Curated annotation (Swiss-Prot):
It comes from Arabidopsis thaliana (Mouse-ear cress). Gene3D superfamilies: 3.30.450.270, 3.30.450.40, Histidine kinase-like ATPase, C-terminal domain (3.30.565.10), PAS domain (3.30.450.20). Residues 1-20 are annotated as: Disordered. Regulatory photoreceptor which exists in two forms that are reversibly interconvertible by light: the Pr form that absorbs maximally in the red region of the spectrum and the Pfr form that absorbs maximally in the far-red region. Photoconversion of Pr to Pfr induces an array of morphogenic responses, whereas reconversion of Pfr to Pr cancels the induction of those responses. Pfr controls the expression of a number of nuclear genes including those encoding the small subunit of ribulose-bisphosphate carboxylase, chlorophyll A/B binding protein, protochlorophyllide reductase, rRNA, etc. GO terms for biological process: detection of visible light; red, far-red light phototransduction; regulation of DNA-templated transcription. NCBIfam families: sensory_box (TIGR00229). Phytochromobilin binds at residue 322. The lineage of its organism: Eukaryota, Viridiplantae, Streptophyta, Embryophyta, Tracheophyta. PROSITE patterns: HIS_KIN, PAS, PHYTOCHROME_1, PHYTOCHROME_2. GO terms for molecular function: phosphorelay sensor kinase activity; photoreceptor activity; protein homodimerization activity. This is Phytochrome E. The keyword Repeat applies.
């Protein structure tokens, strides 16, 4: 472990994790400073005191020192050596002190001016490739030529002088390339390609075990993964840490040596794993410490570098002193930490860690660590599915409870929702609940008494009565409630929802400690550690102290459920008229009827087969395309059993699995079914069948109960016939693979080492890469990675699972997908069918993969249809409903304009008005197709730059202040008030989008963002005078993610990130305005540069009176 702290005080109904994370950085920095001071002064570090009582204010220099030490500490572990080089020359910029010893360079000639031999500094400035054999140097040059350099790791190199082998693990930093060199044993099987692939096969077997587990049990999933990691790595103890919403951690699964103390159930404060460390785990998902007692090695670097080398992604980065001290205190010498990353709503989220500890030094070779990382990626996908399923079940339960409560409100007294079952306690997890209505109080479970509830309600009315969303807090003490202490540990957290000015629903939670148990919590007299010593037991004690007077936090889904019930209650008690008039109901019924008729027409005329069954498996839907394929008319198909009368015997098990899952609410994608064909008089034709690739989709009634299953498919009969023929041919596979027949699907093959051994003509046409370019290349990383860029990490993981399952001889699920971009940037999605080829001994020597392109244009994907329709409805609703508040804002603007206001107030009003016009343009005038094609209608009006500047800055000021970041603005005085002509709102839209993305990706806290605008040459044209303007949006740090920039600048279909799509449209819009944008990375900063020619009525020298910006 290391360091971390937590807190979540009172809040409204929507949590703000960004603020708590920022505050957490300050707490972590304070602990770091305390520890560093203790080392400097020789005094003991009191861990518990520092965690329990962090300072209220942390100096900026402490935070800077903390982040710098974490990222640029200048020390590496001694089990390998590090070399940093310049690109593309490979000139050495820095290296670890032990490099000469590792590479056997003791006889290197002197390069120092003094003539004294300095075996380390003497290496700075030379070509690093000369330290290795010629073939090793060539391998390093090849790796450096690829954009995604890490995909080729590890590069096997040999020292020129000793011929010793090393794993070279490469990554890019701001200064160049960092090479972590880890010694490899000459006889190690992992040195060979076959040995490295064998590690992946071991991981795939572990993944297969994860996939075979029954759903709905996250505990079993965690238990299995710790067993698999322990089996792969051999550590004495392997645990799963889960990070909770308030950032504290918990050991939720463990496998250990029998003589070791159990940590299962241990909770520890957030400071034990700092925010900076968590950020690094998302960047570098495997972290190994070989020996915490070993003395770190210093990194020596060239004097031309302005700051220490960034070691964030270095496999050798030395652990911090407090971390090694903690490990030593718990009896651990070596550790391996593996990040568990899942997708959040907006970005990836560090859910937890799998951590191995060993009681003696332990080194795990890179190929095996890479296999563990692969296992973690697959585990993350499986965990994400389980979390989504659990969330869906919880949401459905909440909706059912809300429905029952609403029914009670309609036919019973209001107190029934507390006194009857189910009641409001069933809506969310809580220890007690209360209803305060018209001065009376109803209580259930563990609650304050009536007078205390009344006092709490009065405090809520006085202090939070204006908050339309209610109040949630995990600590009434921190929320400032005066009577919190008197409630004791029984009531610490509360969720309050007011449904009128003085009527409230309240849910209560008790102290966190009451729900937490750990077998190691009891302090034994023999134990030597005291409260101030860093140890799991003191972590647990510190956590309980930090969590004192605090309950478990309220989850967002729970807050949403409470908020929904509050709205229902408010409507029930304030509405004195029917919700809908008779005319309204009739109109809505007509609209619904029209919508249903249109959907029936779309389904019936679709070019994809669509059919459905009721809950008993009998057909109740059969469109025209399905009838054409099978020869069975809809009138004859209705009522037949899909499993017994339509589907072929070999597909019956797959269908029954689909139906079982769908009727439980779990939908599947890309499952192959074989359907019978029917001849005259509707008799089955047993000599032929049709193959469809289907997606299942649940059908529900108005109460959300599942009443059937719909299947949306794609006809793959001809492709399946070719695959079957290929299997029959067995050894004579070249007949099909080398055929130029356009009906042959894309096919590629892998040898036993995951290298490409076949790539047919259809594959060449699909990907744009010729056979000679890919044959012999590694399929993972090179072919699918460097050549065919994979859509995202999840897509790559799914492909790797299918690939290694195929070459390991395991069955590859027919629903396996591969998603990538071809050479021209076109997005490809295909299902994979695998067929292995074995030698006479039964060993797999080759595996063929057949691609079936998922044609979304010719078919209707039911889940996607639902999702698209829902998204369209949401968008239509937002665009419509936002107009009323916009009209209100516009009316308020008009009133203010006509009143007496100061000049500065008028300037703020103009900024607000410009923001309102920007929103109006987005919702009323946005035509994405016209933007893509460069045909959007541009408007013309007179404007000044200072007004645009005020407007775009106002849109990022809140986030800048939250992050404690500075804004630096440099605008040439002569152009601030220069009258310009053009589409002001669209230029404002473009600049605001660029600035927002710059702000979102600037490091924080205590960083800065810059804007500069400078004039260029004036031009004269037939239609007037123009001035060239250059805008720059600047921020320090590593820059925007490559996926986002690819979305913005590459001319491919589709997009990976929503922000990338927005930037792409901004670029297109700017190009239509005869402007251009570029993104520039420099050593210390990155920036967007916009060059634009704007029409002006006056020259720069004859500008009007200067103004000043209202935002500084």
């Amino acid at each position: 472990m290391g360091f971390e702290s937590s807190s979540s005080a009172a809040s409204n109904m929507k949590p703000q994790p960004q603020k708590s994370n920022t505050a957490q950085y300050s707490v972590d920095a304070a602990l770091f400073a305390d520890f560093a001071q203790s080392i400097y002064t020789g005094k003991s570090f009191n861990y518990s005191k520092s965690v329990i009582s962090p300072p209220n204010h942390v100096p900026d220099e402490h935070i800077t020192a903390y982040l710098s030490n974490i990222q640029r500490g200048g020390l590496v572990q001694p089990f390998g050596c590090l070399i940093a080089v310049e690109e593309p020359s490979f000139r050495i910029l820095g290296l670890s002190d032990n490099s000469s010893d590792f590479l056997g360079l003791l006889s290197l000639p002197s390069t120092s001016h003094s003539g004294e031999f300095d075996k380390v500094k003497g290496l700075i400035g030379i070509d690093a490739r000369t330290l290795f054999t010629p073939s090793s140097g060539a391998s390093l040059s090849k790796a450096a030529s690829f954009t995604e350099i890490s995909l080729l790791n590890p590069v096997l190199v040999h020292s020129r002088t000793t011929q010793k082998p090393f794993y070279a693990i490469l990554h890019r930093i701001d200064a160049g390339i960092v090479m972590d060199l880890e010694p490899a044993k000459s006889g190690d099987p992992a040195l060979t390609l076959a040995g490295a692939v064998q590690s992946q096969k071991l991981a795939v077997r572990a993944i297969s075990r994860l996939q075979s587990l029954p759903g709905g049990d996250i505990g079993a999933l965690c238990d299995t993964v710790v067993e698999d990691v322990q089996r792969l790595t051999g550590y004495d103890r392997v645990m799963v840490y889960q990070f909770h919403e308030d950032d504290h951690g918990e050991v939720v699964s463990e496998i250990r040596r029998s003589d070791l103390e159990p940590y299962l159930g241990l909770h520890y404060p957030a400071t034990d794993i700092p925010q900076a460390a968590r950020f690094l785990f998302k960047q570098n998902r495997v972290r190994m410490i070989c020996d915490c007692n070993a003395t770190p090695v210093k990194v020596v670097q060239s004097e031309e570098l302005k700051r220490p080398l960034c070691l964030v992604n270095s496999t050798l980065r030395a652990p911090h002193g407090c971390h090694t001290q903690y490990m030593a205190n718990m009896g651990s010498v070596a550790s391996l930490a593996l990040a568990i990353v899942v997708k959040g709503k907006d970005s990836s989220k560090l859910w937890g860690l799998v951590v191995g500890h060993h009681c003696s030094p332990r080194y795990v070779p890179f190929p095996l660590r890479y296999a563990c990382e692969f296992l973690m990626q697959a585990f993350g996908l499986q965990l994400q599915m389980e979390l989504q399923l659990a969330s869906q079940l919880a949401e459905k339960k909440a909706m059912r409870t809300q429905t029952l409560l609403c029914d009670m409100l309609l036919r019973d007294t209001v107190s029934a929702i507390v006194t009857q079952s189910p009641g409001i306690m069933d809506l969310v997890k809580c220890d007690g609940a209360a209803l305060y209505y018209k001065g009376k109080c109803w209580l259930v479970g563990v609650t304050p008494n009536e007078s205390q509830v009344k006092d709490l309600v009065n405090w809520l009315v006085e202090n939070h009565g204006d908050d339309s969303t209610g109040l949630t807090t995990d600590s009434l003490v921190d929320a400032g409630y005066p009577g919190a202490i008197s409630l004791g540990d029984a009531v610490c957290g509360v969720a309050a929802a007011g449904f009128s000015s003085k009527d409230y629903l309240l849910w209560f939670r008790s102290n966190t400690a009451s729900a937490i148990k750990w077998g190691g919590a009891k302090h034994h007299p023999k134990d030597k550690d005291d409260a101030g010593r860093m140890h799991p037991r003191s972590s647990f004690t510190a956590f309980l102290e930090v969590a004192k007077s605090r309950s478990l936090p309220w989850e967002i889904s729970e807050i949403d459920a409470i908020h929904s019930l509050r709205l229902i209650m408010r409507e029930s008690f304030t509405s004195s008229r029917p919700v809908l008039s008779g005319n309204g109901v009739a109109r809505d019924a007509n609209e619904l009827t029209s919508f249903v008729c249109e959907m029936v027409r779309v389904i019936e005329t679709a070019t994809a087969p669509i059919f459905g069954v009721d809950s008993s498996g009998c057909i109740n839907g059969w469109n025209k395309k399905t009838a054409e394929m099978t020869g069975l008319l809809a009138s004859e198909a209705m009522g037949k059993s899909l499993a017994d009368e339509i589907v072929q015997e070999e597909s019956r098990a797959a269908l029954e699995s689909l139906l079982c899952k769908a009727l439980q609410g779990e939908e599947e994608k890309s499952v192959m079914l074989k359907l019978r064909k029917f001849g005259q008089n509707n008799h089955p034709d047993y000599s032929s069948d049709v193959c469809v690739l289907v997606n299942s989709c649940t059908s529900r009634d108005y109460t959300e109960n599942i009443i059937g299953v719909c299947f949306v498919g794609q006809d793959i009969t001809s492709e399946k016939a070719i695959t079957d023929r290929f299997i029959r041919l067995q050894g004579d596979y070249k007949t099909i693979v080398q055929s130029l027949n356009p009906l042959i699907p894309p096919i590629f093959a892998s040898d036993e080492n995951a290298c490409c051994s076949e790539w047919n003509a259809a594959m060449e046409k699909l990907t744009g890469w010729s056979k000679h370019e890919v044959i012999g290349k590694m399929l993972p990383g090179e072919v699918f990675g460097v050549f065919c860029k994979v859509k995202c990490q999840d897509s790559l993981t799914k492909f790797l699972i299918s690939l290694y399952q195929g070459i390991a001889g395991d069955n590859v699920p027919e629903s396996s997908l591969v998603e990538f971009f071809n050479k021209e940037g076109k997005y490809i999605e295909a299902s994979l069918t695998a067929n292995k080829s074995t030698n006479i001994e039964g060993k797999v020597i080759r595996c063929f993969f057949f691609l079936q392109i998922i044609n979304k244009e010719s078919g209707l994907s039911c889940p996607e249809l639902k999702e698209s329709a829902q998204s369209l409805n949401e968008l239509t609703y937002v665009r419509q409903e936002i107009k009323n508040p916009l009209n209100g804002i516009r009316f308020a603007h008009k009133l203010l304009e006509s009143s007496e206001i100061s000049a500065s107030q008028r300037q703020f009003l103009e900024t607000s008005d410009a923001c309102e016009k920007q929103i109006t343009t987005i919702i009323e005038s946005t035509d994405l197709k016209s933007i893509e094609e460069g045909k959007l209608q541009l408007e013309t009006e007179e404007f000044r730059l200072e007004n645009i500047l005020d407007t775009i800055i106002s849109q990022v000021m809140i986030i800048l202040r939250e992050r404690n970041s500075q804004l630096r603005v440099e605008v040439a005085e002569e152009i601030k008030t220069l009258p310009l002509n053009g589409d002001r709102v669209k230029l404002q839209l473009i600049l605001a989008d660029l600035l927002r993305n710059i702000v979102n990706h600037a490091p924080f806290p205590n960083s800065w963002v810059g804007i500069s605008i400078s004039p260029g040459q004036e031009l004269s044209r037939d239609n007037g005078r123009y001035i060239h303007l250059q805008f720059r949006m600047i921020h320090p740090g590593k820059g925007l993610p490559s996926e986002m920039l690819s979305d913005m600048f590459e001319t491919r279909d589709g997009w990976v990130t929503p922000d990338g799509l927005g930037l792409k449209l901004s670029r297109k819009l700017l190009e239509q305005m005869n402007g251009r944008v570029s993104y520039v990375r420099e050593d210390e900063r990155c920036f967007f540069q916009v060059d634009l020619q704007v029409k002006t009525m006056l020259g720069v020298e004859s500008r009007g009176t200067e103004g000043s910006s209202s935002i500084k």
